[in-house]
Amino acid sequence: MSRDPTGVGARWAIMIVSLGVTASSFLFINGVAFLIPRLENARGTPLSHAGLLASMPSWGLVVTMFAWGYLLDHVGERMVMAVGSALTAAAAYAAASVHSLLWIGVFLFLGGMAAGGCNSAGGRLVSGWFPPQQRGLAMGIRQTAQPLGIASGALVIPELAERGVHAGLMFPAVVCTLAAVASVLGIVDPPRKSRTKASEQELASPYRGSSILWRIHAASALLMMPQTVTVTFMLVWLINHHGWSVAQAGVLVTISQLLGALGRVAVGRWSDHVGSRMRPVRLIAAAAAATLFLLAAVDNEGSRYDVLLMIAISVIAVLDNGLEATAITEYAGPYWSGRALGIQNTTQRLMAAAGPPLFGSLITTAAYPTAWALCGVFPLAAVPLVPVRLLPPGLETRARRQSVRRHRWWQAVRCHAWPNGPRRPGPPGQPRRVRQGGTAITPPT
């Protein structure tokens, strides 16, 4: 690819390559969860131990995310994505070549350390190539990488694992190898001023004197728990709790992740339209909490709605990531966005690493409904933390226009005679005629 892609088609081509490379890293990070049925059946591995093994890539991510972000700010996206994908592939091949679960866990941990740079680099790459009015949509498409990576793992790994754990691990190894080659051939860093030409204000830390980024980090970390829990345990829940076959459960998980991918594109476009990344995040958090509480209420009751609710939360739980990543790159700027995304992904991965073993133990000792109810507390706690007043640079006018529309609608539906009272029955905005004495009468029909 040309080293100076200025056309619209070239920008979208870079975004597609970035999507594929990031999807390969998420395939490795989340794919181990689809080995759990094989580990339980063939090796008798307890669910808590299998959950710990599935979390090892996330623990590796936690260790290196900030370091990858620092490197990203200094060497650029292409180098980080190529090197990270190659090292992840090497770790996956190593994990597939050993028999001991201990050594498999070690290599999964090392692979997680290597995979840490792809997500941050891919997000910053897309943010750098697209203008504000297209950034939410472009980032939403790029953020389909996670559900697409998980969907491919759910479709392929359980079937390969029927031949053994090692066969299942070879799939992410091959895909990450292809991603490393694609990074070298298809990624071009967006044009930026060198750090030596940047002003002191541009190089200043966005964390100084502001809690905006910390609030986004905290909210996104809390919203990561439903995503982690559903990805890790949906397959085994369908197999053990509902008696589904491995193939049937894998197909449903795949469909759920594909719906989540489409949802990410939709909410990205939504954020461009309303001129805000954070208002949709707050609504997503509230919807995730409500869905998990409903799932906890109907699970074990023999209801036919529990599977539908599981699909719903699997979709809702993945919707917010692209919005948060976009807001961070816009707020932090080109010289701090790598480190800010590194911190963001570190907080998310701490939750992702802690979730499988903790909830695996809870499911074993209590039951699935208890786990769903506790999981619902996390997105509920995120609701007040979301900084909804944060406006994307370049979209402030659009956001204010939306606010004016909402204000006018509210003025229309309020009671004109008593502004602080409830709205009178009837169509919104219906005026009330007032007699000379001040008594309101019903308008003619």
Swiss-Prot record:
Keywords: Cell membrane, Membrane, Transmembrane, Transmembrane helix, Transport. It is found in: Cell membrane. It comes from the Bacteria. It holds the Pfam family MFS_1. PROSITE patterns: MFS. The chain crosses the membrane at residues 16-36, 52-72, 98-118, 168-188, 219-239, 243-263, 283-303, 366-386. InterPro entries: MFS, MFS-Transporter, MFS_dom, MFS_trans_sf. GO terms for molecular function: transmembrane transporter activity. Residues 417-445 are annotated as: Disordered. The keyword Membrane applies. It is a multi-pass membrane protein. GO terms for cellular component: extracellular region; plasma membrane. Belongs to the major facilitator superfamily. This is Uncharacterized MFS-type transporter Rv2994. It comes from Mycobacterium tuberculosis (strain ATCC 25618 / H37Rv).
